[in-house]
């Protein structure tokens, strides 16, 4: 929808991280929705253009969220942003369909570039 502000969901259990990302993303022109749990995000998925997803969440992990998105057939690009960057986590995230995998702390411009690319109306979606 031309002219519509892209909606980015931030799913992270750490409030300081959510708030910092909210400030950054709003300043960059995104509409931001904050969630502390994967289950809360999944209950409010409608209208989200892209999600920044932590892997280690209470209850439903980031991996669980990715699997739930796939099971629903939800076409929401996922940017994994984790403080626990391991080769296994990277491989599993990308295998689960993450479009970008970034480590905390992340450079603001790196994150914004990924989001602008993935939330653009012309962004290509991977085919199943």
Predicted regions and their residues:
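Conserved acidic segment of CheY-like receiver
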Residues: 5-15, 21-25
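Acidic, metal-coordinating helix/loop segments flanking the phosphotransfer/catalytic sites
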Residues: 34-50
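Acidic catalytic/metal-coordinating carboxylates
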Residues: 36-37, 61-64
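Short amphipathic alpha-helix used as the core "switch/output" element in two-component signaling
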Residues: 42, 63-75
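Active-site residues of response regulator receiver
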Residues: 54, 82
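The feature encodes the CheY-like receiver
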Residues: 58, 86
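C-terminal output helix
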Residues: 88, 106-116
């Amino acid at each position: 929808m031309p002219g519509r502000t892209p909606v980015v969901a931030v799913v992270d259990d750490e409030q300081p991280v959510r708030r910092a990302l909210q400030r950054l993303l709003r300043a960059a022109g995104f509409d931001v929705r904050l969630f502390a749990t994967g289950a809360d995000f999944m209950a409010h998925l409608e209208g989200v253009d892209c999600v920044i997803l932590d892997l280690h969440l209470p209850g439903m992990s980031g991996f669980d969220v990715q699997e739930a998105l796939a099971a629903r057939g939800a076409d929401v690009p996922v940017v994994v942003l984790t403080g626990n960057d391991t080769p296994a986590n990277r491989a599993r995230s990308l295998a689960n369909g993450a479009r970008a995998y970034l480590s905390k702390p992340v450079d603001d411009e790196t994150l914004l570039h990924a989001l602008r690319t993935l939330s653009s109306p012309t962004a290509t979606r991977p085919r199943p």
